Amino acid sequence: DELTRVMQKTMPSKRLEQIRDVFVFSCFTGLAYCDARALTREHIITGSNNRPWLRTHRQKTSTPVDVPLLDVPLQILAKYEGCSGNDRLLPIPANQKCNDYLKEIAAICGIEKRLTFHLARHTFATTVTLTNGVPIESVSKMLGHRSLKTTQIYAKIVNDKLAEDMTNLSTRLQHLAM
């Protein structure tokens, strides 16, 4: 899929590699651009499972957010440890610059979809969590949504994709009909 392509593609420059890594980090944490950019060491805590978690507040809504860190974001954090003199965890430039670089990354990876930082949050909700069986209530909490209704928009997208996939499968399996 597209996320795997972005993750596995060798980038032609350090700058694009950093933006790719930050984008992937958000795909696996669900953090919005401004929340990811604001992360410092203090935002990493030991969660109830004795593993590292992110604890922050969504700048947009002031909602508290706790996200258990999977291996991919942990590897990215380790890669950029001490990357900036200002205590930030990740080397994230201005949002417009990020989105310009993401456009380049999409072209390099042969992705026609418009890559933006917000798409990373959407990818976390759909591709990373909901399609892998994470309950919608947990996804909603990690995204910092105040209402489950907001998260249900993502669940509808997943269901629409599921319906499309099953229609395609049905077409391919028609020759097996009894």
Where are these regions (language model features)?
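C-terminal secondary-structure termini that scaffold catalytic or DNA-interacting sites
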Residues: 169-178
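Basic, Lys/Arg- and aromatic-enriched nucleic-acid-binding interface segment
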Residues: 1-33, 51, 83, 132
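Catalytic-site neighborhood detector that most strongly recognizes the C-terminal catalytic loop/helix
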Residues: 58-62, 95, 143-168
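Conserved tyrosine-mediated DNA breakage-rejoining catalytic core shared by Y-recombinases
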Residues: 1-7, 29, 38-77
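C-terminal catalytic core of tyrosine-transesterase DNA break-rejoin enzymes
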Residues: 24, 28, 34, 104, ...
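C-terminal catalytic core of Y-nucleophile DNA break-rejoin enzymes
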Residues: 59-78, 84-104
